[in-house]
Amino acid sequence: MKQQLLKQIKNIIMAANSNLKTLFNGIIKENPVFVLLLGMCPTLGTTSSAINGLGMGLATTFVLLSANIVISLLKNFIPDKVRIPAFIVVIATFVTLVEMIMQAYVPALYESLGLFIPLIVVNCIVLGRAEAFAAKNTVFKSMFDGLGMGLGFTMALTLLGSARELLGTGKVFSLMIFPENYGMLLFVLAPGAFIALAYLIAIFNKLKTSKN
């Protein structure tokens, strides 16, 4: 009896460690933006400000988490021939839900993000995790994978949005940091997105290398 209890505790600890590893992989080791370089369209297109980056990241996180859970639950019932269309239907359902919620409760952010919200449906991060992970793993593992990837994506977009807003307008989350007449318009425009992203990727990889 005692041995069985110890074995169960050991299994629980191992499962928890595995789930935490999956979670942190998405945030750091396999960060979708800074490491895998996925989702570049919303990354470059929505990060003109910190609030836009945060909003887009959280919307994508909700879709990632929800889609991973549902697809993992249904993986044994979806025929292999139609799995991609089925995944897209599941993802599109949650994207529509996010779109309706944002339109109702944060209309200014909804208007600012515009077409990028429905484009979450074809975001390669969301569909990629559904195909590569959720369709092959348990619900709990898929949940942690979706959460980790979503948080990693949110972190990247918020950092990029903050950097661009700070350098472009002297503000972060609309709070004045630098003098009022400060601002480099380049960083609010598309070329500034590429420059800021390149520097953040370099810094992120340098920190990872130093840690290793």
Feature locations, PLM:
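Structural signature of hydrophobic alpha-helical transmembrane segments
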Residues: 50-66, 86, 110-121, 191
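A glycine-rich, hydrophobic loop/mini-helix early in the fold
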Residues: 60, 64-101
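Cytoplasmic-side transmembrane-helix entry/capping segments in multi-pass membrane proteins
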Residues: 78-91, 112-118, 142-145
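Transmembrane alpha-helix boundary signature
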Residues: 97-112
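Hydrophobic core segments of alpha-helical transmembrane domains in multi-pass membrane transport
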Residues: 38-44, 60-61, 65, 92-99, ...
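C-terminal ends of transmembrane helices
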Residues: 67-80, 127-137, 203-207
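Intrinsically disordered, low-complexity non-transmembrane regions of multi-pass membrane transporters
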Residues: 2-24, 208-212
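C-terminal transmembrane helix-loop-helix hairpin of multi-pass membrane proteins
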Residues: 21, 143-212
